[in-house]
Amino acid sequence: GWLELGNPAEALNELAQIECELAVEPQVLEVKWQVLARSDKWDMSLPVAQAFCQAAPGLPQPWLHHAVSLYRLNRTEEAWNLLLPMAKKFPKSWVIPYDLACYACQLEQLDDGRRWLRKACRLGDGKEVKVLALADPDLKTLWPEIQDPRFELLSEEAEPAK
């Protein structure tokens, strides 16, 4: 409700009213993380993401949120290290390789960034992933390559380094 209306403060107030035992439910933690993320409250989002990982370790979303919180707190290497094993745990998720590509580029590991982005293209809709990547400042160093029509053709290269 409140979040869709663009009022994250009211959304947080509503979330504060939730009973303690319900506050650790994955759906509640997901909404709380979204509210904090949209409010740029990354320091507050991190413990919520950690609790979400404990509440729903079998889902990729908590791990993605945890990594994003770390990244937004300028802890990119920690985000990379957290998300890297999740690529194996959730092999069908294109978002995990995409985020790993972003983190690799920010860590100036461009070869890894290329390989992870190509893997994201293979797992997701390659054209949509490419459009998203060309609008993502985290991948700016790869933009000239991504614009090359052959970028998608090269997406059958070897798996990224683990």
Where on the chain are the PLM-derived regions?
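Alpha-helical segment of the N-proximal tetratricopeptide repeat
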Residues: 1-21, 27, 31-38
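Terminal, low-structured helical/coil segments at or just beyond the last alpha-helical repeat
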Residues: 127-162
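TPR/TPR-like alpha-solenoid repeats
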Residues: 1, 35, 69, 103, ...
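Alpha-helical adaptor scaffolds
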Residues: 27-95, 103-108
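Amphipathic alpha-helical segments of tetratricopeptide repeats
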Residues: 20, 54, 88, 121-122
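Alpha-solenoid repeat scaffolds
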Residues: 22-25, 59, 93, 127, ...
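TPR/TPR-like (Sel1-like) alpha-helical repeat modules
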Residues: 105-106, 110-128, 153-158
